[in-house]
Amino acid sequence: MVNEIDSESLSQRLADTEDVLLVDIRTPAEIAQGMIPDALQLPMHLIPIRMSEIPKDRDVVIYCRSGARSYQACAYLMQQGYGRVLNLRGGIIAWARHGLPIVAPEG
C-alpha cells in the first residue's frame, strides 16, 4: 500500500523546512504549465534509469497531475526498496485548488 500526503500537510512540512524532496513525474509539456517550487523534474518513464537521483534516506513526495501516475510510481519505488516515498493525493490539481504556489520551470 502506498502512503499518501495531502496538499495542506505537504505545504506545512515544506514551510517547517523539513527535509522533503519533491519529484514531479509529469511530461515536459505538463511541467511547462507550472510546477511546485523546488521540485526535481523526473518524467515517469525515466524513473528506472534515473532512480539513483532519488535518495533512500529522506522523505520523497512524488506528484503528477492528479495523483494516479504518481501512485504507480510510488508503488514501483517501494518495490525497489524505497521506504520513504509518499504520493501527493490529488496531484498538482489539488495543490493548485488550495491556492498553493506554482512556478514556471527553470530553463
Swiss-Prot record:
Domain Rhodanese: 16-104
This protein's UniProt keywords: Cytoplasm, Transferase
Induction: Up-regulated under sulfur-oxidizing conditions (at mRNA level), i.e. when grown on reduced sulfur compounds such as sulfide, thiosulfate or elemental sulfur.
GO molecular function (one): transferase activity
Annotated effect of mutating C74S: Still able to bind sulfur in the presence of thiosulfate
EC numbers on record: 2.8.1.-
Pfam families referenced in this protein's UniProt entry, alphabetically: Rhodanese
PROSITE patterns in UniProt: RHODANESE_3 (PS50206)
Protein name listed in UniProt: Sulfurtransferase Alvin_2599
UniProt xrefs under InterPro entries: GlpE_sulfurtransferase, Rhodanese-like_dom, Rhodanese-like_dom_sf
Source organism per UniProt: Allochromatium vinosum (strain ATCC 17899 / DSM 180 / NBRC 103801 / NCIMB 10441 / D) (Chromatium vinosum)
Cell compartment(s), UniProt: Cytoplasm
